[in-house]
């Protein structure tokens, strides 16, 4: 009986740890990408210049807002 209870508790502890680890890592990554977006305004300006567009502040801010909205 003691062995069965010990195995059961170990399995439950592993499952709880896996779920907690998943949600903890997910929250950390969301916070990280919010603070450090994968693309910056300078990168957008360079990309628009390479495509032959004249990067105005309005266009750059529109693209940044679209990217922030997609991350949510």
Swiss-Prot record:
Keywords per UniProt: Cell membrane, Membrane, Transmembrane, Transmembrane helix
Organism: Lactobacillus helveticus (strain DPC 4571)
One CC-aspect GO term: plasma membrane
Record's bilayer topology term: Single-pass membrane protein
Protein's UniProt keywords contain Lipid metabolism: no
Subcellular location: Cell membrane
TM helices/strands, residue ranges: 3-23
Disulfide bonds: none
Pfam family of the protein (one): UPF0154
Signal peptide: none
Family recorded in the similarity comment: Belongs to the UPF0154 family.
Name of this protein: UPF0154 protein lhv_1362
């Amino acid at each position: 009986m003691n062995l069965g209870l010990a195995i059961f508790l170990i399995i439950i502890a592993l499952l709880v740890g896996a779920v907690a680890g998943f949600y903890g890592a997910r929250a950390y990554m969301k916070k990280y990408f919010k603070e450090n977006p994968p693309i910056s305004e300078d990168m957008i300006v360079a990309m628009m210049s390479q495509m032959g567009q004249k990067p105005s502040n309005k266009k750059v801010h529109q693209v940044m807002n679209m990217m922030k909205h997609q991350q949510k």
